Regions:
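Alpha-helical scaffold domains
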Residues: 4-210
């Protein structure tokens, strides 16, 4: 049933050529929020290789302008291509286009823009905007970036307040908030401990964190 017709794009054709049916079944179970019909079944190493091969080409440039995509792997490929964008402004602009279409935790969590590694001060401001967004996975992404880039040498006390201030009911936001605070306890114990001792988090997040 899951087969592209004659109207497939070059990228879709390339993805179907990398298909592993057993992996398709596994992935579909792992990500309950998406329609199994949209999962082709491409393993991540093959997807990363394809991303490396097309990064910076006109094909990739066109693809980045075209969300929403039809398939889960197209979204993951899109995320990998964004992660490879070398300049900060370019990466943020591409994320602003793409984040509203992210519809699952796995695509959200593979987004790791290399342009963010220099910890520009602008990123912290951008994270503030993301965690206040209406879209579930934009908020999850913002919390993930706060965890990835600001729990080591870039840490500030206000980051904990920012994360604690995210009061959302969506499971995939609350899980990321708990992950953030669990990591904060490991990396910034003295700063993070009062948030648990003084019950500053909602009960669900508190319980998941510990």
């Amino acid at each position: 049933a899951l087969m592209g017709g004659g109207d497939m794009t070059d990228i879709q054709t390339a993805l179907f050529a990398l298909r592993d049916p057993a992996y398709q079944a596994f992935q579909s179970k792992l990500i309950p929020t998406i329609d199994p019909q949209t999962v082709i079944g491409v393993r991540m190493p093959a997807l990363r290789k394809l991303a490396r091969e097309i990064a910076g080409t006109p094909v990739a440039e066109g693809f980045l302008q075209e969300p929403p995509h039809r398939y889960y792997e197209e979204n993951n490929l899109h995320g990998l291509l964004i992660s490879a964008i070398p300049d900060y402004d370019g990466a943020v602009a591409a994320l602003e286009t793409f984040l509203p279409y992210v519809d699952n935790w796995a695509t959200c969590d593979l987004l790791s823009p290399k342009a963010f590694r220099k910890h520009p001060p602008e990123l912290r401001k951008q994270i503030r905007r993301w965690v206040e967004d209406a879209h579930t996975y934009t908020v999850r992404f913002g919390l993930g970036m706060l965890m990835s880039f600001y729990l080591d040498e870039g840490f500030q006390m206000e980051d904990l307040d920012l994360a604690a201030g995210v009061r959302r009911e969506e499971y995939y936001v609350k899980m990321m908030a708990a992950w953030y605070f669990a990591t904060a306890l490991a990396k910034q114990y003295d700063a993070a401990l009062p948030y648990l001792r003084q019950r500053r988090l909602d009960r669900w997040t508190h319980n998941k964190t510990i």
